């Protein structure tokens, strides 16, 4: 059976390669070749793995490669079909109306992914003595592009699964569908009875037939994940870890927002699945999109502008249409050097643009006017282009922009910030990860400094030399003076940045301040507090520390 | 380290505005101040909140008495302070990280 599978697999690979070659689609062909090589590498690595954690990483790579190969194959099929249909049939649209306007592409970025878990203190956890651990990761697909997040180890001390990855898709259209799939695998060997007590072990082994049969069926159902049929791309190492699809969802333009949102997850596995995790049923993330029309200039050229309200002063400018603004610079170079434009005209969904007629009477041809409503006022700018062709191309650019804004909707209100994802570090030692919840033990009387301390330590402190003014705080003794008659209101006595611990307030030790209006201040502190001045006659040396109520 | 008393220094400050309380026929702030250029800093039991300016008046080079007077002017109901404290530096670092 295995031999037949191998033969089928080889034939499939051959077919795929041939198809890619025949299409002469070098880009897709190159990507396919790359994935096939990666897949071979992952298979070899998996066979050579001795440790479970390594096997988990290798299996994950294999799963991602398989998904990519299948998706590229699907894309190839589609393109081949389109090519064949194009050659044979006479397209009915040839004599029809011109091609439909298509919206600009954009960059879609998903980040700060967090999946809440819902642990219950049921018998399941109490019986298994050891801490159960799972390895999980997310597979994200947009069009034919597939990307994965890092793998995270989960156990019942985590309240959420939080992924650090930023995943960016570069060529998305406004009708994009971003499919998100959560895969999980047991870190312990599936079906291992090493942790269970002997009585439980005998009980389990006697009923192994039924439960293992169920497990095997469950594994086969999700073998390789993302719907790949085992015949096409079988997983070679049968004894290795197996990832199961735990949940999925699809996000579209409606889910895009410059902020965090929660979306529902469709749960795909049930309790009998060996890798089942108690998912709460939602995923939180930040899904941002930057249409190209917002970040790239869509038109530029020389214009003559009549500033609103002034009849005669036509200024020559270099206009650049970018995002929701038409910037008019004094000179073409200013656009690149970051100089402020002479004039900025807003272009948004409410803007009205008209070509021509307004100034024909004044002998100025090829004009267009842009009107915006600001409250009760309407402000109109009139621009003159150089020629009929120039006017046509400006109008075309503006119509395209209006179309893009209608398609990309909320993404065109303001540019959403997208951080270029840093190249991911290789998988580190798979230590148990705590959630921020466990690290924060915040007491009620805390100072903002405590919170910033914890956050700084978590992010990793920058090794910066402290600024000079901090030296003003380093010369103080740490002890309170119990004889001090007045207390100072804000008081935790920290002399230097301490590792986080409960602050001590001294106001409890001191006598409450007396606010009777006195002209003179309180008596100076007893001189034994200043060992430095004891026995010395240093004249100019201050010897007191006065405190006064104000 | 490099702080020399009496020399100008640049620091991160926080603006604090306090409205005085009425106690009898007096306006008070409700806390005490300690120190001054004429005091011994090594006897300071606390190390928080050094005041740089009070209502525009420079406080970095004042004696204890002068400081007290500036804070207790009968005619002023509101005191605006520029205060520096160590934890401000951590807040700056944190905002630079994010």
UniProtKB/Swiss-Prot annotation, chain B:
GO biological process, one term: Rho protein signal transduction
Example of a GO MF term: beta-catenin binding
Keyword annotations of the record: Acetylation, Cell membrane, Cytoplasm, Membrane, Nucleus, Wnt signaling pathway
InterPro entries tied to this protein: PDZ_sf
Family annotation (Gene3D superfamilies): 2.30.42.10
Subcellular location: Cytoplasm; Nucleus; Cell membrane
Entry coiled-coil feature ranges: none
The keyword Repeat appears for this protein: no
Cellular component annotations (GO), alphabetically ordered: cytoplasm; nucleus; plasma membrane
Annotated function: May regulate a number of protein-protein interactions by competing for PDZ domain binding sites. Binds CTNNB1 and may thereby act as an inhibitor of the Wnt signaling pathway. Competes with LIN7A for KCNJ4 binding, and thereby promotes KCNJ4 internalization. May play a role in the Rho signaling pathway.
Subunit and interaction comment: Interacts (via its PDZ domain) with GLS2. Interacts (via its PDZ domain) with RTKN (via the C-terminal region); this interaction facilitates Rho-mediated activation of the FOS serum response element (SRE). Interacts (via PDZ domain) with ARHGEF16. Interacts (via PDZ domain) with KCNJ4 (via C-terminus). Competes with LIN7A for KCNJ4 binding. Interacts (via its PDZ domain) with CTNNB1; this interaction inhibits the transcriptional activity of CTNNB1. Interacts with ADGRB2.
Protein's recorded name: Tax1-binding protein 3
């Amino acid at each position: 059976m295995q031999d037949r599978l191998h033969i089928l697999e080889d034939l499939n690979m051959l077919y795929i390669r041939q198809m890619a070659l025949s299409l002469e689609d070098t880009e897709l062909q190159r990507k396919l070749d790359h994935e096939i090589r990666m897949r071979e590498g992952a298979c070899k690595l998996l066979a050579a793995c001795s440790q479970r954690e390594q096997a988990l990483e290798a299996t994950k790579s294999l799963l991602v490669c398989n998904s990519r190969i299948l998706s590229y194959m699907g894309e190839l099929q589609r393109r081949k079909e389109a090519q064949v249909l194009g050659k044979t049939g006479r397209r009915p649209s040839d004599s029809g109306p011109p091609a439909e306007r298509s919206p600009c592409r954009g960059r879609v970025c998903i980040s700060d992914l967090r999946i809440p878990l819902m642990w219950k203190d049921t018998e399941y956890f109490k019986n298994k003595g050891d801490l159960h651990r799972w390895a999980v990761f997310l597979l994200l697909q947009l069009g034919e592009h597939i990307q994965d997040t890092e793998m995270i180890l989960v156990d019942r001390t985590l309240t959420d699964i939080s992924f650090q990855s930023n995943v960016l898709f570069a060529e998305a259209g406004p009708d994009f569908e971003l499919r998100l799939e959560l895969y999980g695998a047991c870190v312990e060997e599936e079906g291992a009875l090493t942790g269970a007590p002997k009585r439980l072990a005998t009980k389990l082994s006697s009923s192994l037939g039924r439960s293992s049969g169920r497990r095997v069926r469950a594994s086969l159902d999700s073998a390789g994940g993302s719907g790949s049929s085992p015949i096409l791309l079988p997983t070679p190492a049968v004894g290795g870890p197996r990832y199961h699809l735990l949940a999925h969802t699809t996000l579209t333009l409606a889910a895009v927002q410059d902020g965090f949102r929660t979306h529902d997850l469709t749960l795909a596995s049930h309790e009998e699945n060996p890798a089942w995790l108690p998912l709460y049923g939602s995923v939180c993330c930040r899904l941002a999109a930057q249409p190209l029309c917002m970040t790239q200039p869509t038109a530029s050229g020389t214009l003559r502008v009549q500033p609103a309200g002034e009849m005669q002063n036509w200024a020559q400018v270099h206009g650049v249409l970018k995002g929701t603004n038409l910037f008019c610079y004094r000179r073409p170079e200013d656009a690149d050097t970051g100089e402020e434009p002479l004039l900025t005209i807003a272009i948004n969904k409410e803007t009205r643009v008209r070509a021509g007629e307004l100034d024909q009477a004044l002998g100025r041809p090829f004009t267009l006017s842009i009107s915006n409503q600001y409250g009760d006022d309407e402000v109109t700018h009139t621009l003159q282009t150089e020629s009929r062709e120039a006017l046509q191309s400006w109008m075309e650019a503006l119509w395209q922009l209006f179309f893009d804004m209608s398609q990309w909707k909320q993404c065109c209100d303001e540019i959403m910030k997208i951080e270029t994802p840093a190249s991911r570090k290789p998988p580190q030692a798979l230590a148990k990860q705590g959630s921020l919840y466990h690290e924060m033990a915040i007491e009620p009387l805390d100072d903002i400094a405590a919170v910033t301390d914890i956050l700084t330590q978590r992010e990793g402190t920058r090794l910066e030399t402290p600024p000079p003014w901090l030296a003003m705080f380093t010369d103080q003794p740490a002890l309170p003076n119990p004889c001090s008659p007045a207390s100072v209101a804000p008081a935790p006595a920290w002399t230097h940045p301490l590792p986080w611990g409960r602050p001590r307030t001294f106001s409890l030790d001191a006598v409450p301040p007396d606010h009777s209006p006195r002209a003179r201040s309180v008596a100076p502190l007893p001189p034994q507090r200043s060992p430095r001045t004891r026995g010395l006659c240093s004249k100019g040396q201050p010897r007191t520390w006065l405190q006064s109520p104000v | 380290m490099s702080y020399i008393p009496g020399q100008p220094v640049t620091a991160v400050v926080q603006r604090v505005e306090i409205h005085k309380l009425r106690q009898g026929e007096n306006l008070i702030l409700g806390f005490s101040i300690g120190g001054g250029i004429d005091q011994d800093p090594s006897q300071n039991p606390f190390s928080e909140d050094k005041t740089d300016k009070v209502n525009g008046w420079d406080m970095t080079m004042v004696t204890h008495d002068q400081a007290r007077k500036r804070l207790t002017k009968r005619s002023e109901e509101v005191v605006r302070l520029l205060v520096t404290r160590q934890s401000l530096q951590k807040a700056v670092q944190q905002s630079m990280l994010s």
